[in-house]
């Protein structure tokens, strides 16, 4: 069976707590229907669902791509002086290529919770420079550092941020993420993202930042946001998404949306083919304790 020419690489399941409304089993069934050879899971700040997602995808013959949309502190992860919650962290999508990448993602998230927690579990560029091997990075949504600066009209800052990420993730491991999601701001930012891509020779990739399975699930997701923020659907001026297009679009829909920049579609397949992590389950991996000269483990106990 010929597979589709597009794969979703930015997607939030129910493990994006009170934000994602996609159940892994339903996602995998839809990926099969769309003939996708692979699909990613990139929940906010955690990989709580990694084992569940991996097992269910493998059982149905779909390649699971483990990932995470991490929060990146604008400065140091130890800094607690950012003026507001909205400026406390940028978004960055990390996808696991191999065993080393999975180990590094686990280490990054552990550090984020233990050392960088401020509203959200945050990493910083110091950690990314140290623990990037085996990971592919995508520039994320409008809350990504590059997109955020473009939205403010600060093109120089956007170029600087993109150049930093390209240096941190060399060998074609950093991609500029483009989305067509019905948001006017996104369309404006896309133009700037393409400029950044061409100026710095950074490849682009198409995503949809999926938060729910089908378009009609947008209202259910809106109720989930109300629970998250302690509001009701009738609360004025509450937080809500200004689009109903953050669903798992078909390959045909994505190809049509990006017909003017087809490499953004083909690059999803390239990335999927480069991600080949095999999760070894049912094995015991005990920690190694260094033993001083002249000692044994028994003598130390």
Where in this protein do the model-derived segments appear?
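Phosphodiester-processing cores and adjacent nucleic acid-binding clamps
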Residues: 1-301
